[in-house]
């Protein structure tokens, strides 16, 4: 069973009260409809997606969405779910997640990488 640590973060721009980071320890299953078509190919199952063992999931309510596939080959990644009219995902190498988010996402979450 996965344990979840919830941490509120601020947005550099946008709506700070609507941003939350969930750090996931263990495996969880997320509905695959949260994934755009290109990202579904990264995961084996069609219906659900397993993320973990320590996987930061950032939910940001915004009209903007960002996609960054540059870090998908890294062993540690961060998953940014932008809860907008269209849900997209920013997947990046964990070490460069903040930099990638800053360059690609508007708005961008501060502290998007776990310490």
UniProtKB/Swiss-Prot annotation:
UniProt-recorded name of the protein: Putative uncharacterized protein YOR050C
């Amino acid at each position: 069973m996965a344990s979840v640590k919830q941490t509120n973060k601020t947005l550099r721009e946008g709506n700070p009260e609507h941003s939350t980071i969930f750090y996931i320890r263990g495996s969880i299953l997320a509905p695959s409809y949260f994934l755009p078509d290109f990202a579904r190919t990264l995961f084996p199952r069609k219906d659900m997606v397993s993320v973990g063992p320590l996987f930061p999931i950032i939910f940001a309510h915004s009209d903007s969405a960002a996609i960054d596939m540059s870090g998908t080959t890294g062993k540690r990644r961060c998953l940014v779910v932008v809860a907008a009219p269209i849900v997209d995902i920013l997947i990046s190498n964990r070490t460069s997640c903040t930099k990638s988010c800053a360059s690609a996402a508007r708005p961008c979450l501060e502290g998007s990488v776990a310490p």
